[in-house]
Amino acid sequence: LKRNIIDECVDSIDQINSKEFVKNIDLIVLAVPPKQTQGIFNRIDEVWNTDTTLTDTSSVKNHIKLDNVSNVILSHPIAGSDKSGISAANENLFINKKNILCDPFNSDKIHFEKVEKFWKDALQMKTNLMTVNEHDLVFAMTSHLPHLVSYALIDSIRLSNHDVGDNAGGGLKEFLRLSGSNPEMWSDIFVLNR
């Protein structure tokens, strides 16, 4: 609020869990570590099947299980950074990047269109539809495994007690960048996407 980045905030996720609170809210985007996504969806069950659309930003989808919902579309913006927090905010982060949408709950078309419009129009992203299984397999290979290898490599170098800094090439620098990503988020991803 102080930086004029958001118009309104809530102190607790429990504030959201009422039809009265969300009656004037079009879209709620959950941006939490992957292991927290299911729990947050469960805690806001009063918002299920309302006119408010719910989406997430989790890099893993197979663990999200919801029954009888018509307003939840899963999203995965493919636009990240090894930096996190408000100090790492980048207004151009999403422009021309891809966002994967999954609709495992066969939600009402209006909710799918609302989520797609949000990512395309508000954030200038390109969207692609995948099944949950396809999403998790593709990103296990193209994102999750490379991050896992980077953590393992950097840890191996650290444990070797060798100073390789003067001999490090561009490839190692990319692994260093990847291994600098948020460890809580990546730990969740590795555990959830097996």
Which residue stretches match the model-derived regions?
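C-terminal active-site/capping subdomain that shapes the small-molecule cofactor and substrate pocket
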Residues: 187-194
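Hydrophobic/aromatic beta-strand patches that form the interior of the parallel beta-sheet core
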Residues: 10, 55, 73-75, 100, ...
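Short, well-ordered alpha-helix to beta-strand connector turns
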Residues: 6, 25, 51, 96-97
